[in-house]
């Protein structure tokens, strides 16, 4: 597809996020995409629900999916958009919280944060 005048490819790995680095590496190699032109968009339990954080590069923090991406790309040098879904409720299993259906009381807030994320993605791609 396109965003503005830029051609884009949206890759949604069929694996769990924690193993997504391999498919991102394979797609980057197949399409000959330099690492700094890959934009990874992901949810993050360490960021307050509804918040968006944008980074040009950096460490994976506690996010195992980003650890996989960095390991398979061999670099931290790619931009990312983090969509806050945290914190998990107390005494709640982290994996089941992250993989669960969004509760009704959070759907509107999730929609708003996704709109912010989409606006940010458009700006990042347009200014790349």
Stretches found by the model and what they are:
Residues 103-107:
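Active-site oxyanion-binding pockets that recognize sulfate/phosphate
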Residues 62-65:
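Hydrophobic alpha-helical segments within soluble ligand-binding/sensing domains
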Residues 53-59, 97-102:
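Short glycine-enriched, charge-decorated loop/helix-capping segments at active-site entrances
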Residues 1-57, 67, 71, 75-81, ...:
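Nucleotide and nucleotide-moiety/phosphate-recognizing core
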């Amino acid at each position: 597809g396109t965003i503005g005048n830029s051609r884009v490819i949206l890759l949604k790995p069929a694996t769990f996020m924690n193993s997504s680095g391999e498919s991102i590496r394979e797609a980057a190699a197949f399409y000959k995409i330099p690492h700094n032109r890959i934009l990874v968009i992901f949810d993050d339990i360490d960021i307050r629900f509804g918040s968006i954080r944008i980074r040009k590069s950096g460490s994976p923090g506690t996010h195992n999916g980003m650890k996989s991406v960095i390991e398979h790309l061999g670099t931290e040098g790619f931009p990312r958009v983090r969509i806050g879904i945290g914190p998990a409720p107390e005494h709640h299993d982290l994996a089941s919280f992250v993989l669960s259906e969004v509760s009704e009381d959070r759907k509107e807030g999730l929609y708003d944060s996704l709109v912010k994320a989409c606006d940010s993605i458009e700006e990042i791609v347009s200014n790349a």
